[in-house]
């Protein structure tokens, strides 16, 4: 199973293809088996706060990703899907869009205040934030 914050869910038993219908069926099954409202199940499972996907227009995607890496020299850096910078108590991933001149940022931290603080450090490194 794999998933994205953008709402895409991939299932091995569906040839690793995205399937909203399978995701919906899995959620319905979990709610039925658990007996609690979905809102309670989600609250109990949520451990981190997420930024959601934020888009940035950039002239040079690779250079912007390298600025991010350089700004956090103590971070663990992964380059599996774009660049992930992991500082233990928070992390972010920036990956280039394959269809638009955009970088897509996702950031996760312990709470909304930390997400906001880290976004204010990361965003200026990437380019111009856009709403699409």
Language model: regions and residue ranges:
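Phosphate-binding and adjacent anionic-ligand microenvironments
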Residues: 1-132
């Amino acid at each position: 199973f794999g998933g994205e914050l953008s709402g895409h869910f991939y299932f091995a038993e569906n040839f690793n293809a995205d399937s909203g219908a399978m995701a919906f069926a899995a959620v319905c099954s979990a709610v039925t088996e658990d007996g609690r409202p979905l809102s309670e199940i989600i609250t109990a499972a949520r451990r981190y706060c997420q930024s959601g996907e934020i888009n940035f227009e950039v002239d040079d995607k690779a250079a912007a990703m390298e600025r991010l890496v350089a700004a956090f020299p103590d971070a663990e850096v992964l380059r599996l899907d774009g660049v992930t910078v992991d500082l233990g108590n928070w992390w972010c991933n920036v990956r280039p869009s394959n269809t638009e001149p955009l970088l897509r940022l996702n950031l996760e931290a312990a709470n909304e205040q930390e997400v906001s603080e880290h976004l204010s450090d990361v965003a200026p490194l990437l380019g111009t934030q856009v709403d699409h």
